Amino acid sequence: MRIGFDNDKYCTIQSQHIRERIAQFDGKLYLELGGKLFDDHHASRVLPGFQPDSKLRMFSQLTDCIEIVIVISAEDIERNKVRADLGITYDEDVLRLRGEFMDRGFFVGSVVITHYNGQPSAKAYSERLANMGIKSYFHYLIDGYPHNVALIASDEGFGKNDYVETSRELVIVTAPGPGSGKMAVCLSQLYNENKRGVRAGYAKFETFPVWNLPLKHPVNIAYEAATADLNDVNMIDPFHFDAYGKVAINYNRAIEIYPVLNALFEGIYGENPYKSPTDMGVNMVGYSICDDEVCCQASKEEIVRRYYEATNKQVEGASNQGEINKILLLFNQAKITTDTRRCTVAAKNRQKERGCASSAIELSDGTIICSNSSELLGCSAALILNATKHLAGIDHDVKLIPQSMIEPIQKTKIEYLGGKNPRLHTDEVLVALSVLSDTDENCKKALEQLPNLRGCQVHSTVMLSEVDRKIFKKLGIGVSCEPVKNK
């Protein structure tokens, strides 16, 4: 895989920049964490070389000075809000996040329950946390938030909230999902720290949009494609331009809320230490791009992948035409078509030739490998076999899994488990390959190539089953599909 991003440089300069921001205040910084921390696959796709856990690696250089506070809304507890990607409720995800952080050596200080208005379920959750030895605090609903600045920055506003006791200089504020109240928790803490004579600071840690790349740079356009369902729009930060005469990129919601934040900072400090929403950020991603051409191409392919993702969601009834239209507009801005993604062209050509469901993968060296469905294998399962055979130097005509082994598996699926599709999925093929690898050298060689599929791109002419999607995700492969259900 061609590298476009210097991951080691990023970890070094990003952690250093955060230290510098801490030093600007009284040795106390509340850092609102936006986006994904554990598995930032979007960043790894548009910035080849960026590792999905890069942010964790970077923060590991600051472990001794970090305290993590996890935020959850009482309203989300009350309605049992679920994380769609994990299938667990937000209140359970708080515990999962806490465990993940602690397993990696980070100190998790407490949980803040926001939007509290006496909800019984939120009170019960607080008691549950206490029984587990976890500190929790309540932050209350404030009438007119965020626009009633006079009330918010007063003892009847932020002053009513529990003061969250923290012991370290960098407090990372995170949450299971958006709308949890992370920013309000940070601002409330600034108010209450200030009342105690501590001039604490606030900063926002978001990777995208990249503030020091051009507005229409493919990396930034790819961010708009990723948030098309939210209708986020990248913009030139007018406050930054007015203050410095320099162009910086931010997104519409950050720019729209800045006048309110400006007034709140003035209410807390007497002045605003930040002249623009961009100033509030600490993002150093743009300085770590080492090959712009590679990142541009990867981002263009990601925009195409997002388009297919939206069309697939529409078929499932989970997306609307507006999201698709937004991405098609981004196609024009990036000057791309679906053919920009080479594996897309190859898969569609294969289907025309064979007349059945097909798929294609672009390997890290640019080689295209194709497959199609058969009576024995689905096209995704066949693709994994074809790709690993190629990488292992095994002749394409070699059958890694004999038909005599596949047919009993098919019989079990249909006759005993009540399945309708006899073709083997990717997980079943990998299990079979694993069993055979103990006695078959070719199967062993093919299995050993699985790590080399990470970062590769796949396109399928039919929508994938959930199990195939999960396997591709675990292998680190970017997948797109035509919006056609497999029959």
Model-derived regions, located:
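A short, polar/charged loop-to-alpha-helix boundary motif
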Residues: 376-392
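Hydrophobic positions on the alpha1 helix immediately C-terminal to the Walker A/P-loop
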Residues: 185
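The conserved Walker
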Residues: 177-178
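Flexible, solvent-exposed loop/hinge segments and secondary-structure transition points
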Residues: 392-393, 414
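Residue-level structural signal for beta-strand termini and adjacent loop
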Residues: 201, 373-375
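Flexible phosphate-sensing "switch/lid" loops adjacent to ATP/NTP-binding sites
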Residues: 1-174, 189-348, 356, 363-365, ...
